[in-house]
Curated annotation (Swiss-Prot):
It comes from Brucella anthropi (strain ATCC 49188 / DSM 6882 / CCUG 24695 / JCM 21032 / LMG 3331 / NBRC 15819 / NCTC 12168 / Alc 37). This is Xanthine-guanine phosphoribosyltransferase. It catalyses: GMP + diphosphate = guanine + 5-phospho-alpha-D-ribose 1-diphosphate; XMP + diphosphate = xanthine + 5-phospho-alpha-D-ribose 1-diphosphate; IMP + diphosphate = hypoxanthine + 5-phospho-alpha-D-ribose 1-diphosphate. It is an enzyme of class 2 (transferase). Guanine binds at D102, I145. One of its GO terms (cellular component) is plasma membrane. The lineage of its organism: Bacteria, Pseudomonadati, Pseudomonadota, Alphaproteobacteria, Hyphomicrobiales. One of its GO terms (molecular function) is hypoxanthine phosphoribosyltransferase activity.
Amino acid sequence: MSLPDKAFPVSWDQFHRDARALAWRIAGMNRDWHAIVAITRGGLVPAAIVCRELGIRLIETVCIASYHDYTSQGDMQILKGVSETLLENGGEGVIVVDDLTDTGKTAAIVREMMPKAHFATVYAKPKGRPLIDTFVTEVSQDTWIYFPWDMGFTYQEPIAGDKRG
């Protein structure tokens, strides 16, 4: 299995700063948010940070699995939906949080459930970006984001390869 050539490694510190920046942007909208729905699993960490920063106590999850081999996305399956009370009024006043929108397939499924919710991700790729209301950083579609919860400390090859000099 070969992963994409373009890598975007994100440290815990950087992710925390970016998630706080996401909360800052949402706070600037001056709306009355009453709940957050985290898209699991990637949305759990940014949702915790956004909840803290915005003072939101009601946190829900929606669990959607995409079975894949880290090079291609498979079929989407809803493992756990959103509670009925948060689905009322199309999700108005609810922030849906995820770490990343890639193809937009996951966001499309949740947006179908909650068309009036506000969708926020820390990172966005071009294909998924139209489905997201607020994000912090856009990366190219062919970039692989390495999140801190997926990494350990290992040696990294130089970008230029094995050029001596």
